[in-house]
From Swiss-Prot:
Name of the protein in question: Cell division protein FtsA
GO biological process assignments: FtsZ-dependent cytokinesis
Organism encoding this protein: Enterococcus hirae
Chief location: membrane
Protein localization: Cell membrane
Region (Disordered): 401-428
């Protein structure tokens, strides 16, 4: 259960940096502040310029502070799935003390025992997630503290990632004047937050379509089993439009928003619109079908790469189907195209928070909600990884600033797509622009 207090989530994306301030009262989330700044210094989800990224974080934080009426000191920041690896881990210890009652120290010690392994020098342990404990052979225990036992075992998941990515994220947050309260693995937060209990249990695929990369995650038996990352996203669709139509990037983005559809069969070749072409004195007419074919070509490539990875582990056989989210997923026709390519049920997840009902905010909302609901057992295991004491997540200071109303929030840096009505097809699509787990569901 979420603690009562204030929690702040930070999502450092390719196209924008988003900050959400959420207040929890009796485990109910109330979003009281949002910041959304255009990203700089980030390419394909990777930080390439620390100073520019710091500035973008500071802009987003200032917006959130003004709207929430608080001073933000610490954040839970998302860690992307780039080269993320997940493996099972197990630790076992003898219970300390004459009474043999299991304490916080025993939980920390058994987590430390589970970390004993060889890690390549370029990688580091990011997080350990306890799944259950065994006390003297009694299995399935979620919190062993207060129980009596001689032998304590812990079974969990261990997440490792590249030192460079982890360091750069921490460096940017700290240089922005903030404390990293929690480093949250974004695909884990997504699958835990947006899926129902049944979807987590029976198995579901989540595809997060961002501006610079697309992340595929599989949850089964209530565990994150698999992640895959393709460094292509919605920004690449815009670049394709810009190149094919010989127009500026900004014009291409506007065309995608106003006329774009990822499913050509829904569009018409008779519907035309003007395009400002570089080198032409007058706008050139382009039909809706042609634009849709340019968009669908890139989207098909993204989905086919995801399908290839999912086919290797037979994940498409899971009954939960696919849940799409992220800004690029909200483009009209994406759900129809995905359903055609994957051959399973596909749906779009949209956050239900007032003023933030757009998939571009799914990640940051998931980050803050996931961190707010972390258990005490997790926090104890976390100390084994960081070697630090747990930092309070809701350290904020009240300021005399304008209060924030969710209903009036406007996100000028983000694209909001409205799904149009179904359109009739009049021709087929023509020429287009050219893990480590296996059999995990046995």
């Amino acid at each position: 259960m979420a603690k009562t207090g204030m929690y702040v989530g930070l999502d450092i994306g390719t196209t924008s940096v988003k900050v959400v301030v959420a207040e929890y009262i009796d485990s109910q989330m109330n979003i009281i502040g949002v910041g959304n700044a255009k990203s700089e210094g980030i390419n394909r989800g990777i930080i390439v310029d620390i100073d520019k990224t710091v500035q973008a974080i500071q802009r987003a934080v200032r917006q959130a502070e003004e709207k929430a009426g608080i001073q933000i000191k610490g954040v839970s920041v998302g860690l992307p799935a780039n080269l993320l690896e997940v493996e099972n881990c197990q630790g076992m210890i003898a219970v300390n003390g004459d009474s043999k009652e299991i304490t916080d120290e025993d939980v920390r010690n058994v987590a430390s025992a589970a970390l004993v392994r060889s890690i390549p020098p370029e990688r580091q342990i990011v997080s350990i997630l306890p799944q259950d404990f065994t006390v003297d052979g009694f299995e399935g225990i979620k919190d062993p503290r207060g129980m009596i036992g001689v032998r304590l075992e812990m079974y969990g998941l261990l997440f490792t990632g590249p030192k460079t990515i982890v360091h750069n994220i921490r460096k940017c947050v700290e240089n922005a004047g903030l404390v990293v309260n929690e480093l949250v693995i974004t695909p884990l937060a997504l699958t835990e937050t947006i899926l129902s209990d049944g979807e987590k249990d029976f198995g579901t695929i989540v595809i997060d379509m961002g501006g610079g990369q697309t992340t595929t995650a599989v949850m089964h038996d209530k565990q994150l089993k698999f992640t895959s990352l393709d460094q292509e996203g919605g920004e690449f669709v815009t670049k394709d439009i810009s190149i094919v139509l010989n127009t500026s990037f900004n014009n291409a983005e506007a065309l995608k928003i106003n006329y774009g559809d990822a499913y050509p069969e829904r569009t018409s070749a008779n519907e035309e619109f003007p395009v400002d072409v570089i080198g032409q004195s007058e706008p050139v007419k382009v039909d809706e079908r042609y634009l849709s074919e340019v968009i669908s070509a890139r989207m098909e490539q993204i989905f086919n790469k995801a399908k290839e990875a999912l086919d290797q582990i037979e994940a498409l056989e899971l009954p939960g189907g696919i849940v799409l989210t992220g800004g690029a997923a909200s483009l009209p026709g994406v759900v129809d195209l995905a359903q055609e390519i994957f051959g399973v049920n596909v749906k779009l997840y949209v956050p239900n928070q007032m003023g933030l009902r757009n998939p571009v905010f799914t990640n940051v909302i998931s980050i803050v909600d996931y961190s707010a609901n972390l258990s005490e057992v997790y926090q104890l295991a976390k100390i084994a990884v960081t070697g630090e004491t747990v930092v309070a997540h809701h350290t904020t200071v009240e300021q005399e600033v304008t209060s924030y109303d969710n209903d009036s929030y406007d996100a000028p840096e983000e694209t909001v797509y409205d799904e149009p009505e179904q359109k009739k097809s009049d021709e087929d699509v023509t020429t287009k622009i050219k893990g480590f787990f296996s059999k995990i569901f046995d």
